Amino acid sequence: QGFARALVTNVLAGGVEQGASTVNQQYVKNYLWLVDAENEEEASAATEQSIPRKLREMRMASDLDKTLEKDEILTRYLNLVSFGNHAFGIEAAARTYFDVSAHELNPAQAALLVGLLQSVEGLNPYTNPEGAMQRRNTVLNNMAAEGYLDQAEADRFAGAPLGILDKPRTLPQGCITAGDKGFMCDYALRYLADKGLDLDTIQSGSYTIT
């Protein structure tokens, strides 16, 4: 999680400050759309292309820096942002593309996912593997330049295949509305699965928490 946050901070296009501003605005938009909206009308309003909506997002994004640490904003952003193929949040993305948990991502996998944030449709590794690999390798080189990897490691990971699943894993979106608690929500679901309660059973059953 911390590694992914560092990636977002340092390699988003446009530099750290511009990237951080973009993170704030995208987090606000995703929060209003995926968490705060209680019906289709509110969800539509959260994503409409209008100047008032954009100004509201910019104002709310600016206010975030006054109430939350940048690390907390990045964590919340990573828990809600779309990585394409119906994967919202870094945990869902790790499982959708690699069938691993976010904390198990290696640098090449993390770089691929972060690279997708530039254009989740245009850099979809299933429809544009060459573009996705080129972007991944750019991120790896940026990681080396920022000191998160040495250049030899970056070159080694850049020479590796994408390593994605044959087809994206389809996941239920049960943790989207958990917002900034997405990691804990996913942990709870995996814990219950280890105890014999699969997600289908959890979603369809009625349980009493005592």
Question: Could you say what each language-model-derived stretch is?
Answer:
Residues 1-150:
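Peptidoglycan glycan-strand catalytic modules in the bacterial/periplasmic cell-wall system
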Residues 51-53, 66, 70, 115-117, ...:
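Extended, non-catalytic substrate-recognition/exosite surfaces adjacent to catalytic cores, especially
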